[in-house]
């Protein structure tokens, strides 16, 4: 993992560090996407989790963007690696981007809220 500020895989602007309830995330203050390191999504997916509520509230200030999901994204931590677009779970068919190198996930602005429903 690098110590440099990673760039947003959608808009290539630097991500902003956001700490919520002991969880370190990287948020794009332009498009509202969020980078979660491996296993961090599991800490936020429960609809009863207050920290997840706080992050969703922060991301809700960004309007859902018109996103080209056919465009393959590169991992903010490993820029040479193209992330895989996959279904979150059979019960929740939200598509997320996951890095095969580090297991981190990129969620577009409305995807965390959809996962937590």
Protein language model annotation of sequence segments:
Residues 9-15, 52-64, 79-86:
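Short Cys/His-rich Zn2+-coordinating modules
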Residues 8-11, 28, 75-78, 99:
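Short cysteine-rich clusters marking metal-coordination/redox-active sites
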Residues 34-36, 41, 105-107, 112:
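Short, structured motif recognition centered on aromatic/hydrophobic residues
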Residues 2-7, 66-77:
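Intrinsically disordered, low-complexity linear regions
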Residues 40-66, 116-117:
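Short, intrinsically disordered terminal segments enriched in charged and Pro/Gly residues
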Residues 3-4, 11-33, 39, 45:
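Cys/His-rich metal-coordination motifs, chiefly Zn-binding "fingers/knuckles"
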Residues 14, 31-34, 78-82, 102-105:
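Cys/His-rich metal-chelating microdomains
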Residues 19-25, 87-96:
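Short linker/helix segments within small regulatory modules
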């Amino acid at each position: 993992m690098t110590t440099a500020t990673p760039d947003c895989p959608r808009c290539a602007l630097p991500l902003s560090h956001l700490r919520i309830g002991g969880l370190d995330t990287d948020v794009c203050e332009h498009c509202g996407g969020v980078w979660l390191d491996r296993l961090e999504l599991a800490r936020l997916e429960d609809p009863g989790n207050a920290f997840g509520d706080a992050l969703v509230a922060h991301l809700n200030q960004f309007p859902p963007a018109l996103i080209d999901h056919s465009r393959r994204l590169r991992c903010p931590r490993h820029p040479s690696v193209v992330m895989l677009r996959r279904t979150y779970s059979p019960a929740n068919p939200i598509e997320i981007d996951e890095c095969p190198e580090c297991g981190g996930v990129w969620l577009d602005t409305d995807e965390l809220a959809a996962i937590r429903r």
